[in-house]
Amino acid sequence: MKKTFKIALGGIISGFALVLMLLTGIIWGGTYAFPCFAGMLLTVVVIEFSPKWAYCVYGAVSLLSLILAGDKEAVIYFILFFGFYPILKSTIEKLKAKSVQYLLKYIVFNVCVISAFLVGKFILMIPDEEFTIFGFYIPWVFLLLGNVFFLFYDRCVTVFISLYIYRIRNKIFKK
């Protein structure tokens, strides 16, 4: 494909992803949902071009989100996991052993989530009350629930990829 087409499609995907990231500061619950959806959009770039191009789009969306988005916690989640995981997923799934795939996916997820927690706590200065329910400090419970959610999220990314390839792609790129 021509480089101009790659740049144009990358710009369109970047724009859509950035709009989702901007909505994190406007719509309640967007802190977690919109970074997920924004990251899923990057799979289109992986499918149409390459992971290299998708990482460029990820970088642009990350930088612009850091500058423009109101919900910095959501931006941290996007930068440290949701933005690059759908791109990395394609590389991990090239491995033959499913058990190794899942092990790597969970290692990546847990390292990223713990990093996001530490960035939020020590750089964004999110107070301990945000991680407290009924007076109990429960980040480990959040991590456990996050691991359950991750299995669902990974499956959703796979379903989105299939939906894009088999239903949406031909409608966008008519030949």
Q: What do the PLM-derived regions correspond to, one by one?
A:
Residues 1-53:
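Hydrophobic transmembrane alpha-helices
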Residues 3, 136-175:
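Alpha-helical transmembrane segments and their cytosolic interface
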Residues 122-137:
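Membrane-interface helix termini and inter-helical loops of multi-pass transporters
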Residues 7-12, 33, 55-59, 75-76, ...:
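Hydrophobic alpha-helical transmembrane segments
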Residues 71, 106-123, 147, 151, ...:
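Mid-bilayer segments of alpha-helical transmembrane spans in multi-pass integral membrane proteins
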Residues 79-114, 118:
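Short helix-perturbing small/polar motifs within transmembrane alpha-helices
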Residues 38, 57-65, 81-82, 105-109:
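Transmembrane alpha-helical core residues of multi-pass small-molecule transporters
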Residues 22-31, 62-91:
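Interfacial aromatic-anchored transmembrane helix boundaries in multi-pass membrane proteins
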